[in-house]
């Protein structure tokens, strides 16, 4: 993995070859026959799953830009966690959206490679033939992936968004040799749902990085007291794209206020979360048949933590004002996993 990290950081794509045949079978073909080997994976900057190649508290996005019917569609996937989002930015909004997404790799149709708004992403661009972004093929691929007859259940997507999302799925299938990680349903980010912060403003405000580079001294570095990698990634994503919806902001503030007032419960939750491993990324590796015993143990320990969190949120906390609906929903969604934990134990 040391060599792999160096090559990826330098912008290379790496083909992983493995032995695909038993030596005894090779000998049957002749005394000097070579054991069969094949490429089992292409490692690219946007398709990383190894913890050693990823930042624990930052997403690593594989993004795709498509054009259809005069519109631009952008889709981005964190292959290590399965988070999948699409958006329909105007040409003037695209640079700001790309800064928000901060892709590790950006798939683009060959005709768009020379567009001025992509100039600063030169080293991150992976040009593909225009047919890779066809919306009809993209819709078919998405329906096959999620096992649905149509995409209507997921929301209303433009042809450009579908083309971009389909290109992402196809590229993952190509690099993973026909395998797909665990994927969330594609979520549409509405243009006015989050605040647009352009690159210059983001740098001047030092939202995610300080002027000298790194988190230390940035807004994120100051406010990040999360106990888990997943929590750190969520906080960074929310700071990168602050809500503009008053109702949504109010719901978040209700949850903050409830936990500020319930200091005892808050302390117990922090203690429980501190022992909770990151299970999103182990799940992603296992779904690609790339995980190991350590990943299974992380999922077991994470599920035990989920049960503890669920019980804490349902405890009688001594006269506390009823928890906000979003916290109750989160507690319910944690579920019970005793049988699975037993099997993993």
Region locations from a protein language model:
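Aromatic-lined, polymer-binding surfaces characteristic
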Residues: 270
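Charged, amphipathic alpha-helical segments characteristic of ABC-type P-loop ATPases involved
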Residues: 273-345
């Amino acid at each position: 993995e040391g060599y792999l990290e160096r090559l990826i950081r330098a912008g290379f794509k790496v083909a992983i070859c493995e032995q695909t045949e038993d030596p005894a079978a090779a000998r049957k073909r002749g005394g000097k026959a070579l054991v069969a080997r094949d490429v089992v994976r292409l490692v690219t900057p946007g398709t990383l799953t190894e913890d050693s190649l990823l930042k624990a508290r930052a997403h690593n996005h594989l993004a795709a830009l498509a054009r259809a019917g005069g519109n631009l569609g952008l889709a981005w996937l964190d292959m290590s966690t399965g988070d999948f989002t699409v958006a329909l930015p105007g040409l003037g909004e695209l640079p700001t959206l790309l800064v928000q997404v901060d892709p590790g790799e950006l798939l683009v149709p060959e005709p768009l490679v020379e567009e001025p708004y992509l100039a600063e992403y030169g080293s991150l661009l992976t040009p593909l033939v225009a047919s890779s972004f066809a919306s009809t093929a993209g819709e078919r691929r998405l329906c096959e992936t999620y096992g649905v007859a149509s995409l209507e259940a997921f929301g209303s997507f433009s042809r450009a968004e579908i083309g971009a999302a389909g290109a992402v799925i196809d590229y993952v299938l190509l690099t993973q040799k026909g395998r797909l990680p665990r994927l969330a349903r594609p979520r549409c980010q509405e243009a006015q749902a989050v605040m647009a912060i352009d690159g210059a403003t983001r740098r001047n405000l030092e939202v995610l990085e300080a002027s000298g580079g790194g988190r230390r001294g940035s807004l994120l570095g100051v406010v990040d007291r999360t106990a888990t990698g997943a929590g750190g990634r969520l906080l960074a994503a929310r700071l990168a794209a602050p809500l503009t919806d008053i109702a949504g902001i109010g719901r978040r503030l209700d949850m903050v206020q409830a936990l500020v007032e319930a200091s005892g419960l808050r302390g117990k939750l922090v203690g429980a979360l501190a022992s909770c491993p990151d299970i999103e990324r182990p799940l992603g590796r296992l779904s690609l048949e790339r995980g190991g015993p350590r990943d299974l143990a992380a999922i077991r320990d994470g599920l035990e933590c989920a049960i503890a969190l669920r019980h804490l949120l349902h405890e009688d906390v001594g006269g506390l004002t009823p928890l906000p609906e979003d916290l109750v929903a989160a507690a319910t969604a944690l579920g019970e996993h005793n049988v699975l934990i037993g099997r993993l134990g």
